[in-house]
Amino acid sequence: MVRDLSLNGTILQFLEWVDSPPLVIPTQNQSKPMQIFKEFSFEAAHRLPNVPPDHQCSRLHGHSFKVRITVEGEAGIESGWVMDFSELGRAFRPLLDQLDHYYLNDIEGLENPTSENLAKWIWLRLQPNLPSLYEIEIRETCNSGCRYHGD
């Protein structure tokens, strides 16, 4: 329905929706979850022991790995954020220190360091202290990687 409103002698028109629900501004409990992420990079060498001997990944080689850690939650009313990005960085730092410039095959749990196994390895170590963890993304090249959402 269109109604007229007079403001200082000027007629303004506005729409009034019949039978429309009132506008509700979400509170913290009513807002939808959001996902935020932080990206990290590290250099490491590895080889894949379970591929045929003539496969290129059977030989020692290195990557500039990219890791994207995503958490999910509701933005706080006071803070306006899901999580402080620096807090996310602090949570991942101990794992990053174990990976950067190391031979991944020598790390316990990464004897077969595929991107998939690396994502799961990170998840299992990060999730107990980061319950809002949503996804781990690993990129071992510009166009190859995996995403993991936990067990």
Spans of model-derived segments:
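Generic hydrophobic-segment detector
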Residues: S6-N8, P52
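Charge-rich, low-complexity N-terminal segments
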Residues: I25-D151
